[in-house]
Amino acid sequence: MREYLPDTKFVHSSNGHDLRLWDDQRRNSFVDLIKDSTVFINASKIYQLGQLQLLNLAYETAIEHNIQNYTVINIGSTAEFDPTQFEMYSIEKNALKERSRQLASKGFRSSHITIGNLDHVKGIGKTIKLVLEHDPFLSMVKIEH
């Protein structure tokens, strides 16, 4: 990922960030991260619609603080296409995809990326870079390797 996005700040539990928005302290911490950035790559696997909650709070924060051209890149899953096998995980990823589509239709820079059969994480970084640099903005990307 760093090869394609060298200025990326990674936020995860092992470096002190808890993105489960279960209390005001965590929500406020996330809001501060959004206010101090221009792009949020929404890739955390948090059950109970955690990615959807992160997308909604990023959107609300960008609107409330008038952050122009804020971008959210949502990382989907091929589980979106197999609800029989992946059940709730498929439902959560499809909810994320649909909400991203709704926000994009309002003019908010939200993109949903689904990459199948990926052997190397670097493919995700390359795809995110493509979305960020593409004009017009790509609100939905599906790639099969």
Where are these regions (language model features)?
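Structural motif
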Residues: T38-V39, T71
